[in-house]
């Protein structure tokens, strides 16, 4: 079985850095600043609408912020218990993967920082913002394995529901516990230990 993680907001605490970068360049790139902390109940699509960004602008903006994020990737830390969770799952015989919009370089810097590089055998970086459904479907075909996905956003839940992949949501990322629980009842973990125990029970 593969345990596949989202990166931003699930493995890596990028919320503050990401929010800062997005708002820092708002005037230059022509969109409205967003108070991300006050809008954790909003989906990515709702936040895009609030910012005034047009959907055709999204690919270019993502490329821009991937580059900026790589420049500061060394600042990114793992959430509490995540390195230990990854090691414990690997030791139990689970295969590990990552599917994310984040750049391969940022992921590599992060995994090297925590000595986790060799534990992940499937990494699909730089997918489009709303391309997770397709990426998960392709992973199932390629890996020929059962998958459990670990993510922090509503769009993770939507992608997994569309591909019939079970998901464990985590409460420490982009979306609030309340909105995750509403959309993925009984499967929202508040700690890395809860993620581990939920996987083992499955």
Locations of the language-model features?
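Short, acidic loop-to-helix structural element flanking the phosphoryl-transfer center
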Residues: 71-98, 104, 108
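Conserved Lys-Pro-Asp/Glu-containing loop-to-beta segment of HAD-superfamily phosphomonoesterases
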Residues: 2, 132-157
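Non-catalytic pre-domain segments flanking phosphatase-related domains
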Residues: 1-5, 193, 200-201
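Conserved H-loop
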Residues: 32, 54, 117-121, 186
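N-terminal helical cap/lid subdomain that shapes the substrate entry/recognition surface
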Residues: 2-84
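A short, structured active-site edge motif that brings together acidic residues
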Residues: 35-39, 117-130
């Amino acid at each position: 079985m593969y345990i596949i993680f989202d990166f931003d907001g699930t493995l890596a605490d990028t919320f503050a850095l990401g929010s800062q970068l997005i708002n820092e360049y708002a005037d230059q790139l022509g969109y409205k600043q967003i108070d991300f902390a006050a809008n954790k109940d909003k989906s990515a699509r709702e936040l895009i609408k609030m910012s005034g960004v047009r959907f055709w602008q999204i690919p270019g903006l993502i490329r821009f912020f991937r580059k900026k994020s790589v420049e500061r990737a060394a600042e990114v830390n793992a959430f509490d218990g995540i390195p230990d969770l990854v090691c414990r799952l690997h030791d139990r015989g689970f295969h590990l993967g990552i599917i994310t919009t984040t750049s391969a370089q940022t992921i590599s810097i992060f995994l090297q920082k925590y000595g986790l590089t060799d534990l992940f055998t499937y990494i699909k970086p730089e997918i489009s913002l709303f391309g997770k459904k397709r990426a998960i479907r392709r992973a199932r075909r390629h890996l020929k394995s059962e998958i459990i996905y670990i993510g922090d956003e509503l769009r993770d839940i939507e992608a997994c529901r569309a591909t019939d992949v079970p998901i464990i949501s985590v409460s420490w990322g982009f979306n609030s516990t309340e909105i995750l629980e509403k959309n993925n009842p009984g499967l929202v973990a508040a700690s890395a230990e809860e993620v581990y125990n939920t996987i083992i029970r499955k």
